[in-house]
Amino acid sequence: MASSTDVRPKITLACEVCKHRNYITKKNRRNDPDRLELKKFCPNCGVHRAHKESR
């Protein structure tokens, strides 16, 4: 089981417009302590949009 203090936890990225959770990735907590935001393709919207880390 993954620890809550894991250095590279799994996170879910959700589209900012339609709120669909499209991507699962890992992030390094030491390098990115804040919420991650990436520009990814949203298959629901059909365009590239900002995806933020959801909790």
From Swiss-Prot:
GO terms (BP aspect): translation
PROSITE patterns: RIBOSOMAL_L33
MF GO annotations: structural constituent of ribosome
GO CC terms in record: cytoplasm; ribonucleoprotein complex; ribosome
Highest taxon listed in the record's lineage: Bacteria
Keyword Cell division assigned: no
Key words, A-Z: Ribonucleoprotein, Ribosomal protein
HAMAP family per record: Ribosomal_bL33
Name of the molecule in the record: Large ribosomal subunit protein bL33A
